[in-house]
Structures are given as C-alpha cells and as structure tokens.
Amino acid sequence: KVLSEILDESDRRPDRWLGPSVDPLTRFLWARAPLAWPQMATYALYRLECGLRSSAVLGFIGLPTLGFQLDTFFRQGEYGAAGAVMAIYITLIATVRLWMRPRLLLGWLIFAAVMLATVRTPPMGQGALWRFLSQDIIPAPLRQGDPAALLPWLWELTTTAILPGLAATLIVAQLALVLAGAVAFVAQAAIVPRVTGRVGAGLGHLVLVILRSFPEYMLAYLFLQVWGPSMLPAILALGLHNGAIIGHLLGRQATGLTLRADAPRGLTLWGWEIVPRLFGPFVALCLYRWEIIIRESAIMGILGIATLGFYLDDAIGELRIDRAVVILAATGLVTVGIDALSRAIRARLGAGDLHVGDARPGAVPGQATNC
C-alpha cells in the first residue's frame, strides 16, 4: 500500500517522455521504479524498525523479548535494570543502518532461517483449535440453543462495550493525529543540515531515534507512571511516536532533495522550499498513520484506557471469546472505514499530484532531453 503511494508521489514526467509505444513493464523498470527506489529503500528499513518494536511489544504478553524483560523489571521495581534494557533497545534501533546493509542482507536471511529451524512448535491441547472454531467463537445465545436472544445479546454488547470503546478510541486517535502532524511538521526540518546545521541535525536525529525507538505501548506505560490512568498518556505516546516516524521519513526525503546552487539556508529554506515540495508526502504519510493510530489507540485499552482494547481485554480475561471476536470485528470495520476515508481525503486534496521532483524547463513529453 505504501509502496504504491510512493510510486504515485514520484515524478511522472520521465514516464511521459518515453512516449506511448513503450510497454508498461519497461516504463516501470526504467521510468518509475528508479525515481521511487530511494524512498522505497528508506521505507523498507523503517519497516524493519517496526518489526523490532513489535517484537518488543510482544514481550508484554509473554514472549521472551526485550519488552518482557522491561515489563518484568518494572513490576519488580528494578528501575536501574529497566533503564539498561531501554538503553540497549535504543542502541539497537539507532545502529540499524550499520548492521543492516544491503550486502549483509543475504547473511541475515540465512541466519534467520537457521534460527527458525531450531524453534519447535509449542504443544497445544488436543482439539484446542477445533474447540476454538466450533465453540468458543460462537455467540453464547447460539451455543445455548436460543437464536431469539442473539439480537438482544448483540445490542447489549454494542451499547455497553463497542460504542463507548469506539468513542474513546476516536477521541484518542484524533487528538494523537493532530499532535503527530504538529511534531512531524517541525521534525522534518530538524534533521536537515542546511536548515539546522550539522550539530542541530545530529541532535534532531538523536531525539527522533529515541521517540521512534520506543513503541507507543512502552511510551504510554512510562507516561502512566507520571500522569496516572487517563487518555493523556496514550495521546502523548501516540502523537510523539508517530510524529517522530513521519518527521524522520520526511527529513530523509528533504535531505535528498536536489536544490539550486543559490538555495537559501535555515528557516527560509524550510518554509519556502522544503515544506511546499514535501507537502504531498506529508499529507499521504499523515493519512496513512491515521489508520495505524486508530488501531494503536484501541490497543491502548490494555493499559486501562477505556478504548476498544479495554473491552477486548476484559472479554478475553473472562474467557468470553465470542464477545472478543465481535469487538475485534468492530475494530476491523472501523479501520477499513478510516482507510477508505483517508483515501478519499487524499484524493480530494490532490496529495497524489504533488510530486517531489525537479523542474526541467523546456522539457516536452515524449521527446528525449539533455538530462
């Protein structure tokens, strides 16, 4: 999805210069993909960072990752050890460009395959999967042979769990999106040396690495220790983390922009060159993260915030898997709706028509030029 949007954002003038007789595959390989490749590679590396963050979050549900160690140390009050785990995690993310290089990719893939081959499938109870599919997820009225009670059961679940959880989820997500947009708008220039200088860009990278390294769940967990259980920790965690991600991606694009020889520096360059040229990617990334923020807002319910995840966790804790499945389905429908709405807004704003490219005066589509 994102790679498709990156292609949409790339300059299409080389495609037009090839003329109508060139086949689609050649157009893609020689006119579209080369322009989008740097952004695609940056995004692929970012997805690796997402995988590292997700692995850490899975530690909170029992997997022996760094998140498991962090949660254990916090529960035991060993804050020094928890700080060491966080330092290791930040170092792992900050050095990802050193240990994940293209020439090392094959070696990492072989290493991963060897590690996976040593993992044994955990034992499951006899018939556990079939029981889950044939009994646990079946609504209680149908399991009890009372189909007439299905609609009242759904209505009660909707009014007492889904609607309140959805309202809280949307409130948290919208406020977090506004904060993320504000953070990204400023952060995109913080890592560009021509805007903030080498020292400023280095400090900007450090701040963004820290905010990007910690999963939203971890940040919210830390903020809960300061502000207590409320929507504020979730809003701050989601806004800062997603804003840092968007700002990092935009900053990488801004650093790679081709500028004129007499281009200014500092805030003048940021306000009059970088912001207009990256407005399309800024809107596209914000709308893309909007859908993700919705899902993450729901997950925040596990920490006690009354979003959809709170009611989902409550249903699972009571072993009422049928209620949990309905809440999950509602969350999925909301996510699909937000995705459709974000696409419509992006098309309405024309974000896909604002390409990041360099103007070439006098170029005529379909004709070769002295590039």
Give residue spans per PLM region.
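Transmembrane alpha-helices
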Residues: 2, 24-57, 83-84, 91, ...
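Cytoplasmic-entry segments and transmembrane alpha-helices of multi-pass inner-membrane transporters
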Residues: 1-7, 186-222, 248, 252, ...
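Loop-to-helix entry region at the N-terminal start of transmembrane alpha-helices
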Residues: 1, 160-173, 212-247, 279-281
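N-terminal, non-cleaved signal-anchor transmembrane helix
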Residues: 89-205, 350-371
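Transmembrane alpha-helix boundary and packing residues in multipass membrane permease domains
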Residues: 43, 55-59, 68, 189, ...
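Hydrophobic alpha-helical elements at and bordering transmembrane segments
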Residues: 48, 70, 162, 166, ...
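Short helix-to-coil transition segments within interhelical loops
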Residues: 9-36, 63, 257-278, 305
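Hydrophobic alpha-helical transmembrane segments of polytopic membrane proteins
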Residues: 65-101, 309-344
